[in-house]
Each structure stands twice: as structure tokens, then as C-alpha cells.
């Protein structure tokens, strides 16, 4: 599981051993924060230091029983992987400005494929007012590496100022044809489950939109599949014209 300190400070003890304090921000809009990764079987004691401490716990069940998720020669369990609890500071995270124009946003990868973990992938995205993210639209609901990897995802939203909102868009197939499509208003504290489909997000003008994203699947490779009809917007060499589709999955950001 992954514990992200959203605000304030918490004292952490692991198996009776004091790990010190986690937390370096008053809100997630201030910048990247501290996190704690706990592999299956690890237990930690957490205690708030003062008022205003707020944390988020994200977890995925360890592979168990028959089926493709079960540990085996091709998929070791936490003991075989040598996974240990660890503190993740802002300096350990990959922070990048992704996109351009009104789909530019900051992405903070807390737990990426390059970090040792059993199932989880996680990070934070910060949309400036009026800007889009998870754009060009992408999905990850089919296991077809290296073109796409199957990962379920959850978003936890925060809005600054908190009275604002954003919009979570979801669609399958052709957005202008007969397909499953929706647009949902999200406010501060909302959670959105994304089991499948393309899922871009936009912040309302005047409000900064933050979301913690957490993914889990059989594997931990991130191969998002871009909607090729809209991928051209991220290709500066195409002159900003539709029709010059970019399909490389590694171009997608959160």
C-alpha cells in the first residue's frame, strides 16, 4: 500500500522503530509531498503531529490464488522481490511539465515503474485553471504490450479555491459515434473510478485542479494507448493539424 501525506505532518513508526516525521506541505497545491510505501505484510503506526494532518491510503490486494496474478516463476511475490518499506520524499519523485498551451500540467510521479513495488503505480497531477490533463486522451484497459497495458485507475480530486470544480470525461471508441460516453462534474474530495476507456480531465477557469492518481494491474508497465485522432496536438512537428496522428504510447502523460 501507499500512504500519501496530503497536508500537515505525521509521525511514523515501523515495527516499533521510529522513522521520524512525514509531511512538508499545507496543501497538495504547494508542491510535491512525502509518501510511505508498505509492501504486503508490513505494518506501520501513524500519528498526527498537530492539527490539519491529512493523509490518503491507497492499496491493491496482493496476487493470491489461481490465475495470472498469482506469484510464480514469472511473477515473484514480495518476498522474492526483496520489497521493503520505504519513505518517498519529493527528491525521490519524478516531476515534469507535460503538454503545452491549455493542456500543460505538472505531473509528479510518486511510484513509477522504475520504483520497486508489487502492483501499485501512483502520482499527482496539477491542472492550472482552464487546462486539460490526461490529454491527448489515452486509455489502458487492454493487455497488449508494448502498445497498451491493462491498469485500473482511481482519481482523488482537490480544487483550489475549494468551491470550484472540474470535469471528468470518459468515452469508449468514437467520441462522435455510438459509444459509451459521459462528462461528470467533480468537486473537492470527489473520487472517480476509471476501469476502462479514455478519460481526459479539465479544470474550470479560475480554479486549479489537483488529483492523486493510483493504478494497479497484473504488471506495472505503463503503456497508455493514445486516441490517435487527437494525438497530433502533442506533435510540434506537425504544425498543429489533425491527420498527423501520433500513436506512440510513451507520449502520454497523466
Positions of PLM-derived features:
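Double-stranded beta-helix
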Residues: 52-109, 205, 212-254
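A short secondary-structure junction signal
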Residues: 67, 80-88, 120-123, 131-140, ...
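Catalytic core of Fe(II)/2-oxoglutarate
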Residues: 180-191, 198-226
Amino acid at each position: 500500500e501507499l500512504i500519501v501525506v496530503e497536508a500537515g505532518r505525521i509521525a511514523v513508526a515501523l515495527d516499533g522503530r521510529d522513522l521520524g516525521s512525514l509531511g512538508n506541505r499545507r496543501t497538495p497545491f504547494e508542491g510535491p509531498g512525502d509518501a510511505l510505501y508498505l509492501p504486503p505484510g508490513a505494518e506501520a503506526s501513524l500519528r498526527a503531529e498537530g492539527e490539519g494532518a491529512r493523509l490518503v491510503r491507497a492499496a491493491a490486494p496482493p496476487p493470491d490464488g489461481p490465475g495470472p496474478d498469482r506469484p510464480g516463476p514469472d511473477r515473484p511475490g514480495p518476498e522474492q522481490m526483496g520489497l521493503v518499506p520505504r519513505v518517498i520524499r519529493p527528491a525521490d519523485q519524478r516531476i515534469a511539465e507535460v503538454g503545452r498551451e491549455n493542456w500543460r500540467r505538472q505531473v509528479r510521479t510518486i511510484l513509477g515503474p522504475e520504483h520497486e513495488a508489487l502492483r501499485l503505480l501512483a502520482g499527482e497531477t496539477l491542472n492550472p485553471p482552464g487546462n486539460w490533463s490526461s490529454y491527448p486522451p489515452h486509455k489502458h484497459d487492454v493487455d497488449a504490450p508494448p502498445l497498451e497495458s491493462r491498469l485500473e485507475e482511481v482519481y482523488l480530486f482537490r480544487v483550489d479555491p475549494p468551491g470550484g470544480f472540474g470535469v471528468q470525461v470518459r468515452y469508449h471508441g468514437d467520441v462522435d459515434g455510438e459509444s459509451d460516453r459521459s462528462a461528470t462534474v467533480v468537486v473537492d474530495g470527489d473520487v472517480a473510478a476509471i476501469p476502462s476507456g479514455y478519460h481526459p480531465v479539465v479544470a474550470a477557469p479560475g480554479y486549479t485542479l489537483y488529483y492523486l492518481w493510483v493504478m494497479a494491474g497484473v504488471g506495472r508497465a505503463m503503456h497508455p494507448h493514445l486516441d490517435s485522432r487527437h494525438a497530433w496536438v502533442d506533435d510540434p512537428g506537425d504544425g498543429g493539424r489533425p491527420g498527423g496522428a501520433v500513436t506512440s504510447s510513451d507520449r502520454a502523460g497523466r
